[in-house]
Amino acid sequence: MKFLADLEQLLVERRQNMPEGSYTTKLFQSGPQKILQKVGEETIEYILDAQNADKQKAVYEGADLIYHFMVSLVAQGWSLSDIIAELEKRHKPKGGG
């Protein structure tokens, strides 16, 4: 998880500084709709490789998917901790019998 936190911090810095020549900068400059389109494309690529049980390609596309998903979060001003908090909320033991 530390790596994902570090990656998120790098993405936040890229959004603030917009270094020239950075792929991430180009994504942020393209706007939220284009970023979300890229998330969709990477999702489809991951699904196709996973359905074909091609682990190497699925892992590669999964990494692309996570990266672009995180870019979409940062572009919206959201964070990975928002997603983690929701997952934790869903997995808390339910009260009662």
Regions inferred by a protein language model and the residue ranges of each:
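Flexible "arm" and connector segments at domain edges
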Residues: 1-62, 66-97
